[in-house]
């Protein structure tokens, strides 16, 4: 079973259209994890480009920990707080290329990998892996990289 949650009803509606086109059976819920009272816990949580948008990151991560089964895996992809990420993700993607609406990102909410690792470790997550993600705009593809200066993903396991 697959469940997708999002705070934005618009995002849920778009996701439902994508799932329908691909004939996928996904249960979507318009809710934030902090408000999800789930009896069944999840084996895997994918936080992909989410944490840089939440108001209370500590509460959000605590909620994810609570919703994850013991030894469950969480993937957290986000943006590093560097000058390079500011130039690429805000100036480039929002102002120059107009891939995203201006104001989508707040650079102050970007989080360095070591800061995110510290928060997750404090919650009793075990860090399994980290990798950089680089986007090639000419080929429209993402590649894994050792460079975590802009986009990166952390893989952690609930202890």
List the predicted regions and their residue ranges.
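Short, flexible, mixed-charge acidic loops at enzyme active sites
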Residues: 85-95
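Conserved SAM-binding loop
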Residues: 1-86, 113-116, 154-158
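Short low-complexity, flexible loop/linker segments enriched in glycine and/or proline
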Residues: 18-21, 91-92, 142-146
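Acceptor-substrate binding/catalytic loop of class I
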Residues: 78, 95-115
């Amino acid at each position: 079973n697959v469940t997708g949650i999002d705070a934005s009803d618009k995002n849920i509606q778009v996701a439902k259209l994508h799932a329908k086109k691909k004939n996928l059976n996904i249960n979507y819920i318009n809710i934030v994890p902090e408000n999800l009272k789930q009896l069944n816990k999840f084996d895997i949580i994918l936080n992909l480009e989410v944490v840089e948008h939440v108001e209370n990151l500590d509460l959000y991560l605590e909620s994810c920990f609570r919703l994850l089964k013991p030894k469950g895996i969480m993937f957290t992809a986000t943006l590093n707080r560097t000058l390079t990420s500011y130039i690429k993700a805000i100036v480039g993607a929002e102002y120059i290329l107009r891939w995203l609406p201006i104001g989508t990102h707040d650079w102050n909410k970007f989080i360095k990998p070591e800061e995110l690792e510290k928060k997750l470790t404090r919650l009793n997550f075990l860090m399994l892996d980290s990798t950089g993600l680089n986007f090639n705009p000419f080929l429209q593809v993402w590649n894994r990289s050792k460079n975590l200066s802009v986009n990166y993903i952390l893989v952690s396991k609930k202890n």
